[in-house]
Amino acid sequence: MRILGSLPNNIRKCTFKLILQKRYSHTDILKELLYDISDSQKFIPSASPIASNLLRVSSYGKLSSLFIEYSKARSKKEFDQLRTSDFQSILRSVVCPKNGKNIRHRDRDLVSLQIKLILQDADRLGIQFNIVDYTHILRVAMYTGNKHILEYIVARVKEKRIRPSVDYFNAILGVIGGNRWSLSKFQSPAFRGSPVTEPVSGKMLDMIEVDFPNYDLVPNSTTYDYLMVGLSRDGKIREIYDLIDTVWGINENSSSKKVDCGNVTFPTHHTVFSIISALGYLGDVSSAVSLSRKLTSVYKINFPELAWRYIIYWSIASLQFRAPAGHARIKNIELFIRLYSQMYRHCVPIIEIYDTSIKFYMKHGRFGLLEKVCESWTKQFLGSLEKQNNEVKKKHLQLLEKQISKLMRYAETERPHDTKRVSVKWSNVLNQIHSSVGDPAKP
């Protein structure tokens, strides 16, 4: 822009016009690539009032509001003049809130019914969806746990002779085997007992070995992420180790780089999350941490801070599982919290990691470990003050004060002999926090 500003007016206008033309041409090419539209049907941005209204309602995040507005427009027969791009926009606005985490049965049914109505209206109006649209439907089905729609979509794609993509097959794998967010909904094979579940990994392997080659498609890292989750659900821990070793060259004894950066199977942060979730679901959290850290070291990937949320969660959940003993598991949790606070002591701490651990230790009466977690949280909070804005500081300060107050009240009821020491120690800590933040200490 500085160079353009130094040019004469007429030259500057011509140059700027050429730049804009070039930019718009790249934008048009990108739209065609993203939406996979045929030559006879160029992408046109949605501008109809009906579609705009539905997209506005969907942005509020309330599925019931979107369903009501869609039903009203449907009853008035306002969809007859809509373009394909309008229907695509409406379809892709139907998403699963929080990726299916703690979703209510009512919302799950609403999502399924909404998709069913959109497909019916599209068929009635002769609108053809592409593979990206069907992939979106399958992803929504994966997050809602709705397997009934899978056979319908697969049959529909075959009937219309639409060429599948890797993302489409990955979405099918996700519907069959679930994803790492849904593992907590299933009873682990490592649980005390012998849960009976329908095997899923066999179907997933058949798809990777048969369907992918039939369409000259190559599995990518996401494919193996879903496969690890499926193997985990079936309790096949040895197969998970073999998969990690075969694809990425990482095992318990040695590690070697097998995949180059340009390869589609090059591991990502999602691979780290999947390894931790798959092995943590089977109770082997220590191996999950070891293998995932080796993977990030060999492939020069930053060990994601979010991974520690999975580690702490599965460390706590695995206390219900079979061997080893629960006492050793609690020591593991303490170790992982210390590792997390040391590795990210200058980063803004993830509140959920400490909050989850504090609730767990309070429930099981582990007061010594409870104090250590609060100490780790305090140190990391004070060490990361420079990187926090005022809003984040205020939020962290309120939550930390709340947990420390709970700790002091807990000591009064459960450890009356230790009340004085706890009160003096943590009152001083609160004063230190307030003075560091710049907020005057409360009397």
From Swiss-Prot:
Compartments, record wording: Mitochondrion
PPR repeat ranges, renumbered to this chain: 130-164, 220-254
Pfam family, one: PPR_3
GO cellular component: mitochondrial matrix; mitochondrion
Cited Gene3D superfamilies: Tetratricopeptide repeat domain
GO molecular function: mRNA binding
Domain of life assignment: Eukaryota
Transit peptide extent on chain: 1-13
Outcome of gene disruption: Impairs growth on galactose, leads to low viability on glucose containing G418, and leads to strongly sensitivity to antimycin A on glucose medium.
GO terms for biological process, alphabetical: mitochondrial gene expression
Recorded coiled-coil stretches: none
InterPro entries xref list: ATPase_expression_mit, Pentatricopeptide_rpt, TPR-like_helical_dom_sf
Keywords assigned by UniProt, alphabetized: Mitochondrion, Repeat, Transit peptide
General function of this protein: Mitochondrial RNA-binding protein required for the stability of the atp9 mRNA.
Protein name: Pentatricopeptide repeat-containing protein 6, mitochondrial
Lineage: Eukaryota, Fungi, Dikarya, Ascomycota, Taphrinomycotina
